[in-house]
Swiss-Prot record:
It catalyses: (6S)-5,6,7,8-tetrahydrofolate + formate + ATP = (6R)-10-formyltetrahydrofolate + ADP + phosphate. NCBIfam families: PRK13505.1. This is Formate--tetrahydrofolate ligase. It comes from Rhizobium rhizogenes (strain K84 / ATCC BAA-868) (Agrobacterium radiobacter). Keywords: ATP-binding, Ligase, Nucleotide-binding, One-carbon metabolism. Belongs to the formate--tetrahydrofolate ligase family.
Length: 559
């Protein structure tokens, strides 16, 4: 029996083209690329600006059912579909997010696709890449430093230290930093106050980077960040502290999309990386818009299940950027459907058609939800070797009864050859003219009503609960002119409910709103539900324990 190669072994054996050649495939002159080595480059701002009058290609969203902790291969399917479209003669670009060090060293061990459907250089993308996350972290913490410095030197803006909302950021899972006391150690260190850290991918600066249309818009949004409140309860903005210019300088290069390639030497833009459970979960607007000008088809993903990533892609990213998707793909795996049907993790490798059919209710809910946005949809069954024919047919039959099609995809094992059928179906849907995209709710509804619409229509909740402080805060923001903003729900990715242990398609559950945060620069209100954390912790046996350099100096353990 042949040994199955690991993702990193496959990536390392790939025959990469020089990044200048990948750019040439898209018509990008060498002088408009800023190479980082030979296999990655940033696309110049002037080249991007010159594309504005070109027609747009078709936009395809890849989303998924509620995942198992290991993920269901959404990025793998996104990359595979991009390769598949190129294989059948279409000019396609993949747009995905950059990987965070937190989950890389925590649970996932990497996030650049898998098997024979990866973006490369895999090690670089998963680690420091082109430094974008470091730039975001630096800009975020520069603002934090300027806040405490302003207070130290007299507090001219009369900031109420009890009402500072801006926390610090770090691209790592570190529960010890969730709540801290800063400025201890005496007068020379400033005024002690409570604070904390969020993971960089939950930072408003990351969201701003991913939603800004250009450098001018970036600086304006950075200035709009509310860092806290004065004693008279009026908001203090980043521009009040003269932070916006310096923050924009730190982010100047990070704003430019990163060009890399797939294993099959097709172009991919990897840019931005907000989480979908605690942020809006989509790659950058500037990368997506650039790709739409350069290709006939753009395949992008939104994080976690369609209840989180897809809803935010539609209601936040598309609304803000004026994008209209032409088709959607929902990735499902037999193992995740069985888990949603009540099968324990250790038993997922055994055939269980009965549990699978029960778990298909989760897939059916996601299918119905995507259709609510007016986007035609197809299901991709991401094949695992443990899947049986009976299980695969059960999924296909279930989806057919809902008036859609489920297509078995073997891109992980076979690359683009294993996903041709899905590629043809996506072209058919995208060219059909069926797409009549519309967000779930209009801008002019009250914020609480927007929360209730997402909870009832997407999660099928029976009730939204929020205490008086939360309701008063939402009304206060409406009075300040922020009522038109969309809501960004922070919720567990493992369930439609706020309880990660409730699988399937629960009905009538309660969504408890614990906290709300105004991201005035990004342009949305974050709604924190259940026990979700904006600074994750590491698991008992983190992936970091299995990552090392071998005797040849190569990285092992990324997967």
């Amino acid at each position: 029996m042949a040994t199955v190669k690991s993702d990193i072994e496959i990536a390392r054996a790939a025959k990469k083209l020089p990044i200048i050649e990948i750019g040439a495939k898209l018509g990008i002159p060498a002088e408009d690329l800023a190479p980082y080595g030979h296999d990655k480059a940033k696309i110049g701002a002037q080249f991007i600006a010159a594309l504005k009058d070109k027609p747009d290609g078709k936009l395809i969203l890849v989303t998924a059912i509620n995942p198992t902790p290991a993920g269901e291969g959404k990025t793998t399917t996104t990359v595979g579909l991009g390769d598949g479209l190129n294989r059948i003669g279409k000019k396609a670009i993949v747009c995905v997010r950059e990987a965070s060090l937190g989950p890389c060293f925590g649970v996932k061990g990497g996030a650049a696709g898998g098997g024979y459907a990866q973006v490369i250089p895999m090690e670089d993308i998963n680690l420091h890449f082109t430094g974008d996350f470091h730039a975001v972290t630096s800009a975020h913490n520069l603002l934090a430093a300027l806040i405490d410095n302003h207070i130290y030197w007299g507090n001219e803006e009369n900031i109420d230290v009890r009402r500072i909302t801006w926390r610090r950021a770090m691209d790592m899972n570190d529960r010890a930093l969730r709540d801290i006391v800063a400025s201890l150690g005496g007068v020379a260190n400033g005024y002690p106050r409570e604070g904390g850290f969020d993971i960089t991918v939950a930072s408003e600066v990351m969201a701003i980077l991913c939603l800004a249309s250009d450098l001018k818009d970036l600086e304006k949004r950075l200035g709009d960040i509310i860092i806290g409140y004065r004693r008279d309860r009026t908001p203090v903005y980043a521009r009040d502290l003269k932070a916006d210019g310096a923050m924009a300088v730190l982010l100047k290069d990070a704003m430019q999309p990163n060009l890399v390639q797939t294993l099959e030497n097709n172009p991919a833009l990897v840019h931005g990386g907000p989480f979908a459970n605690i942020a809006h979960g989509c790659n950058s607007v500037i990368a997506t818009r650039t790709a739409l000008k350069l290709a006939d088809y753009v395949v992008t993903e939104a994080g976690f299940g369609a209840d989180l990533g897809a809803e935010k892609f539609f209601d936040i990213k598309c609304r803000k950027a004026g994008l209209a998707p032409d088709a959607a793909v929902i990735v499902a795996t037999v193992r995740a459907l069985k888990m949603n049907g009540g099968v324990k993790k250790d038993d997922l490798g055994q055939e269980n058609v009965e549990a699978l059919v029960k778990g298909c209710a989760n897939l059916g809910r996601h299918l119905a939800n995507v259709r609510k946005f007016g986007v035609p949809v197809v299901v991709a069954i991401n094949h695992f070797v443990s899947d049986t024919n009976a299980e695969i047919e059960a999924v296909k039959n279930y989806v057919a009864r809902l008036g859609a099609e489920a297509i078995l995809c073997r891109h992980w094992a076979e690359g683009s050859a294993g996903i041709e059928e899905l590629a043809y179906k996506v072209v058919e849907l995208a060219e059909s003219g069926q797409a009549k995209f519309q967000p779930l709710y209009p801008d002019n509804l009250p914020l609480l009503e927007k929360i209730e619409i997402v909870a009832s229509k997407i999660y099928h909740a029976g009730e939204v609960t929020a205490d008086k402080a939360v309701r008063d805060q939402l009304r206060s923001w409406e009075d300040q002119g922020y009522g038109y903003l969309p809501v960004c729900m922070a919720k567990t990715q493992y369930s439609f409910s706020t309880d990660p242990n409730v699988r399937g398609a629960p009905e009538g559950h309660i969504v408890q709103v614990r906290e709300v945060r105004l991201s005035a620069g990004a342009g949305f209100v974050v709604v924190i539900t259940g026990e979700i954390m904006t600074m994750p912790g590491l698991p008992k046996a983190p992936a970091a324990e299995r990552i090392f350099l071998n005797d040849q100096g190569y990285i092992e353990g990324l997967f």
